[in-house]
Regions:
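A Lys-centered signature of the CheY-like receiver
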Residues: 123
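Active-site residues of response regulator receiver
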Residues: 21, 68
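Active-site beta3 strand of CheY-like receiver
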Residues: 59-66, 93
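Two-component/phosphorelay signaling modules centered on CheY-like receiver
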Residues: 24-43
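Alpha4 helix (beta4-alpha4-beta5 surface) of REC/receiver domains from two-component response regulators
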Residues: 78, 85, 89, 98-120
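Helix N-cap/capping motif at the beta->alpha junctions
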Residues: 22, 44-53, 76
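Receiver (REC) domain active-site loop signature in two-component systems and cognate sites
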Residues: 71
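Non-catalytic signal-transmission and effector/linker regions of two-component phosphorelay proteins
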Residues: 1-18, 31, 116, 126-138
Length: 138
């Protein structure tokens, strides 16, 4: 086990993370990466609307949301605006495998709305980058 994952495991054990992404492969990959970092309370949603329903069903707010910018039905920007209206207080990691400029716009929207941006990354996100982003929540 690498130093990154062995150190991170105990630090992230109590964190809850919600992953919102329309790509099943990305949902699985992020889930596996989070588990390898010690996060065990992981929830997934296939788009922003499902993500909002999941948030209301959870017993508490997740410490972190990992959100794809480009999704059908409700994209990442609409999802971020809804998070603001719902008073979400946790950290947000934006991810995209597509246009970086849209991710920058989404990040600006989140910051302007008072959301706690942890970072914005292109897919695939290296596990060391994800570990560092989660560590910034502490």
């Amino acid at each position: 086990m690498s130093d990154i994952t062995s150190t991170a495991k105990s630090a992230h054990a109590s964190k809850m993370v919600l992953i919102v992404d329309d790509d099943p492969f990305s949902l699985e990959l992020f889930s596996e990466m989070l588990m390898s970092l010690g996060v065990t309370d992981i929830h997934t949603a296939s788009n922003g609307r499902v993500g909002l329903r999941t948030l209301t069903d959870l017993p508490r707010q997740p410490n972190c949301l990992i959100c794809d910018v480009f999704m059908p039905d409700m994209d990442g920007i609409e999802f971020l605006e809804a998070l603001t209206k719902n008073g979400y207080q946790g950290g947000i990691i934006l991810v995209s495998g597509q246009d970086i400029s849209m991710m920058a716009i989404a990040q600006e929207v989140a910051v302007a709305d008072g959301l706690k941006m942890i970072g914005a990354y292109t897919k695939p996100v290296p596990i060391a980058v994800l570990a560092e982003a989660l560590a910034s929540l502490d």
